[in-house]
């Protein structure tokens, strides 16, 4: 494995068993100030400590022992999230379709134009940054929600489900004023100003439950039983 540092926050991981290809890709990517780490085999890449969360992978399809497609599958099973750009000298349309179907970002045929590769890498890095921003936003939601008490979470869940303060008070066996006090503290802890802001906050950090169609709170189980 070889690494070249330019100070860029993103890293392009190049996996190709041809030294000339690795060298040319390193030169090309360094020319636009991208950090590069190269590997001559899928095994070397799998054995490496890839802790970087910002970047993409440029991967040769046909390599000895473990092919690019097999490496893609292994990375998928490990939960590896960086976008993958495949390079192939064989122009196999079916193989390209298979790779993209399994989540590859792009598939380029050798010999490729330098600009085509740079465009693909820049697009992959932009996608990775977008994914990272969304993950960071989700984590911020979770961190804020973690400041709420169990009772506040119960009330928030019911507010999001559309229950009024009077309905929540009846469901939980507490007074209307207590519900309103909890609602105010929830809004304050989350750094919001209104119930409308509260609904928007939850919707931005949630996804629909595949079982019941409800939109659960971030970090909660999809179908939480009523308290």
Swiss-Prot record:
Protein known as: Transcriptional regulatory protein TdiR
HTH luxR-type domain residues: 141-206
DNA-binding positions: 165-184
UniProtKB keywords: DNA-binding, Phosphoprotein, Transcription, Transcription regulation, Two-component regulatory system
SUPFAM superfamilies: C-terminal effector domain of the bipartite response regulators, CheY-like
Modified residues (4-aspartylphosphate): 60
Pfam family for this entry, one: Response_reg
PTM remark: Phosphorylated by TdiS.
GO MF annotation terms: DNA binding
Protein's job: Member of the two-component regulatory system TdiR/TdiS, which probably regulates transcription of toluene catabolic genes (bss operon). Binds to DNA.
GO-annotated biological processes: phosphorelay signal transduction system; regulation of DNA-templated transcription
InterPro entries named in the record: CheY-like_superfamily (IPR011006), Sig_transdc_resp-reg_C-effctor (IPR016032), Sig_transdc_resp-reg_receiver (IPR001789), Tscrpt_reg_LuxR_C (IPR000792), WH-like_DNA-bd_sf (IPR036388)
Response regulatory domain segment(s): 11-125
């Amino acid at each position: 494995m070889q690494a070249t540092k330019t100070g860029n926050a993103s890293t392009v991981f190049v996996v190709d068993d041809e030294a000339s290809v690795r060298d040319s890709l390193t030169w090309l990517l360094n020319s636009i100030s991208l950090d590069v780490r190269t590997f001559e085999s899928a095994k070397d890449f799998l054995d490496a400590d890839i802790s970087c969360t910002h970047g993409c992978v440029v991967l040769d399809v046909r390599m000895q022992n473990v092919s690019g497609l097999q490496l893609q599958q292994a990375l998928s099973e490990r939960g590896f999230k960086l976008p993958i750009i495949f390079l192939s000298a064989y122009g196999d349309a079916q193989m390209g379709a298979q790779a993209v179907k399994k989540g590859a970002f792009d598939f380029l045929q050798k010999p490729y134009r330098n600009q085509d590769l740079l465009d693909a890498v820049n697009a992959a890095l932009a996608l990775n940054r977008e994914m990272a921003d969304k993950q960071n936003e989700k984590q911020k939601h979770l961190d804020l929600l973690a400041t709420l008490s169990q009772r506040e979470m119960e009330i928030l869940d019911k507010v999001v489900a559309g229950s009024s303060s009077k309905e929540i008070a009846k469901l939980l066996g507490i007074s209307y004023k207590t519900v309103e006090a909890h609602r105010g503290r929830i809004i304050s802890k989350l750094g919001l100003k209104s119930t409308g802001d509260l609904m928007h906050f939850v919707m931005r950090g949630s996804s629909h439950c595949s079982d019941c169609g409800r939109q659960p709170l971030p970090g909660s189980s999809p179908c939480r039983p009523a308290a």
